Amino acid sequence: MNQCYFLSSFLSPQQPESPPLYSFQEINDLLALNFTDKDWQSYVILRRFFDLENFAFFWAGKSIPFSFGTITNSNVESLLRLQMWSDEWEFEDFFKDFLLRYKTPQERLTHFSELVRDFLDHYQDYPSEFLRTYFRFKQDLRIILAGFRARVMQKDVSFVLRDEDSSNPIVLHVLMQKDSPNYELPDEFFELRDVLGDYGRLPHMLNQTLSFYEFHKVEEMSRDKYLNTDAILSRLTTYLMAIRSSWASVQKGKELINLMEKGIRW
């Protein structure tokens, strides 16, 4: 409780449009001193989720652009070869099954969404209430966006969601929209209606707006939590989002400069 009180009072709220309040190293150093082993484990799982897409970069034959320390350019091959996150922590059974089912990098890349789905589902039994809530939100949001994308691209939504759990109310809701003239969202996602309507066909704007939406939803998840690990994990999630957003903004700037330089040379 003393550590939670200290961290809750020390860690300032992050604003979605602002630069990161703390560097990734500063966060790690602070938590290493104040988190219990159990709390640290929850933080590691959160970072793994943020880093999960780095496997997709690797299977696509691309360099991993950014990491929160769990899946990096230097360790990704050994992680997959040994099927272990660390000396003490093996890959989860769903991950081992995924690697057994899909042998080639192209197969794994094609079916990467299955890995994300299974990761989010697996941790629905995890002790941390925040991680359960956040991962369920991410799972449901993933399904809603897949349904919206299918509609925009005029694809059969039942085919797009063929591998999803048909008992999930969100999956059922999206499937019921198949022949509807409008894409009606579940009540818990009603705030997305205007976002998808205004920015749904502009990928860059949609990505930015969705980030703001997710940021505020994460804040809501800890609104009634005080002086406990779940409240801290919620705030840490906003920090990780801000750090990743800051990095992405820098990369976009570099890409723009590179394009300008190529234009001058041409």
Curated annotation (Swiss-Prot):
InterPro entries: DUF2764. Belongs to the chlamydial CPn_0087/CT_309/TC_0583 family. This is Uncharacterized protein CT_309.
